[in-house]
Each structure stands twice: as structure tokens, then as C-alpha cells.
């Protein structure tokens, strides 16, 4: 009888010692950290966006790829600083990354591949400054039409 209790406790203790499955947000953090450990990376990169965005309904096991965008920060890559406290570098590099999700024994094995982003994070021209130009052009056209019609 004692051996049954010992066996039961050993099984329960072993089950409790198993690592918790990796969540989507944790996998993204692990992928960014993996990229930052590369020898060619001087300044650390931080997560800019992910597709899909992290949320309670996103399960890592349902994804085939992690797709995310990272941006260069002002912190050194191997300084040990918390990435959340690092500010993005003005005109810093932006990279689009992908990592196939391979689950082995409840752990994710990530092979991160990043390329320079084609999206330019600098300011874009806005529509509103062009409105006065358009109004003046239309008004000049109307005045020209009226002048021609009078003749």
C-alpha cells in the first residue's frame, strides 16, 4: 500500500515538474531574443508588430509561422538591458521576420529569418496640405470657363 502512495506522489511530482507550454507572446519574445544574440547585431532590436497581434485567442500550436516586424533600439545587443525600457532608434533599421514554429516536447524550436523591411517608418505626406492647392486649381478653372463663355 505504501508503494502505491509513493508511486502516485512520484507521478504527480513528475507531472508538476514539466515546463508549461510556451505561449504566443513568449515565443515572440524568444524569437526576438534569438535574433539579438547574433554576432552581427550591434544594437538590440525590439518587437514593433506581429501578425497576428498577441491576444488571448491566439494559440502557438495553431500557427505554422511566427511573422513579426522588429526595429532597432538605442541599447547594445548584449548589454543585458530590458528591451521594453529601450527606446527605438530614430531612423533605426526595420526588419520583417519569420520563424517556422516547430514544437518539440512542448518547447518551440525557432529558426528566425529577417530581411530589411520595404516599409519606411518615416513620415508620410498627408492629404490635407493638398486641399488648398486643389481648391485654387478648380477655382482658376471655373474663372477661365466663365471668361470664355462671356465672349
UniProtKB/Swiss-Prot annotation:
Pfam families membership: Cathelicidins (PF00666)
Location in or out of the cell: Secreted; Membrane
Propeptide segment residues: 18-122
GO terms under cellular component: extracellular space; membrane
Tissue-wise expression: Detected in bone marrow, liver and lung.
GO MF annotation list: lipopolysaccharide binding; membrane destabilizing activity
Keyword tags: Antibiotic, Antimicrobial, Disulfide bond, Immunity, Innate immunity, Membrane, Secreted, Signal, Transmembrane, Transmembrane helix
Membrane-protein topology: Single-pass membrane protein
Endpoints of the signal sequence: 1-17
Function: May bind bacterial lipopolysaccharide (LPS). May have antimicrobial activity and play a role in the innate immune response.
Family indicated by similarity: Belongs to the cathelicidin family.
Name used for this protein in its record: Cathelicidin-3
Protein species of origin: Gallus gallus (Chicken)
